[in-house]
Swiss-Prot record:
Pfam families: Ribosomal_L4. Residues 43-96 are annotated as: Disordered. This is Large ribosomal subunit protein uL4. GO terms for cellular component: ribonucleoprotein complex; ribosome. Residues 51-71 have a biased composition (Basic residues). Belongs to the universal ribosomal protein uL4 family. Keywords: Ribonucleoprotein, Ribosomal protein, RNA-binding, rRNA-binding. GO terms for molecular function: rRNA binding; structural constituent of ribosome. The gene is rplD.
Length: 205
């Protein structure tokens, strides 16, 4: 079990928290993290590309010329794939690019990212994080108090925190159940509350 300093919203010490080694202390598996990010990005693809095959192209119902006697190659439709303006063979059609991964792999990926944050000292734990109203200025002030710069991912169930972060280019706030591998990798610093740590450990430990 590893101990990590806990701070309040003003950047002052507020005790320590003991982190579960099964979640925050494993050997990071980069290949599983990579596969998980590829899966997440695949699930975001629109998959709406579509072309027309010979049955979808308008026209071409009449045989262009008789079968025999003209000296030309036999043709059944002017919308056959070999014709200019004809249908496309094996072209893209609307589909979902999403696919599944085993639950153990998904959990190993997020645990690997959390453990890497611990190794890199990019994990910050707050005793609590709450805002009375959505104010971006207050959130910026809090981040300055914590001496945090660069890209920051905040994990908090407080809706006001999530709304306050929407207008900041390098800050993103997600609920605990919205914590994912791609965001955790893309954002340098990770800010968790003690309640968030507890919920994460309940699921992953």
């Amino acid at each position: 079990m590893a101990n990590l300093k806990v701070m309040d919203q003003n950047g002052k010490d507020s005790g320590e928290v003991t982190l579960n080694d099964k979640v925050f202390g494993i050997e990071p598996n980069e290949s599983v993290v990579f596969e998980t990010i590829i899966r997440q990005r695949a699930g975001k693809r629109q998959g709406t590309s579509k072309v027309k095959n010979r049955s979808a192209v308008r026209g071409g119902g009449k045989k262009p010329w008789r079968q025999k006697g003209t000296g030309r190659a036999r043709q059944g439709s002017i919308r056959s794939p070999q014709w200019r303006g004809g249908g496309t063979v094996f072209g893209p059609t609307p589909r979902s690019y999403a696919y599944t991964m085993p639950r153990k792999q998904r959990r190993l990926a997020i645990k690997s990212v959390l453990s890497q944050k611990m190794i890199d000292k990019d994990l910050i734990v707050l005793d609590k994080l709450a805002m009375s109203a959505p104010k971006t200025k207050d959130l910026v002030s809090m981040l300055n108090s914590l001496n945090v710069d660069g890209k920051v991912l905040i994990v908090s169930d407080d809706n006001n925190v999530q709304l306050s972060a929407r207008n900041l280019a390098k800050v993103k706030a997600v609920p605990v159940n919205g914590l994912n591998v791609e965001d955790a990798v893309n954002y340098g610093k990770l800010i968790l509350t003690q309640d968030a740590v507890k919920k994460i450990e309940e699921v992953l430990a």
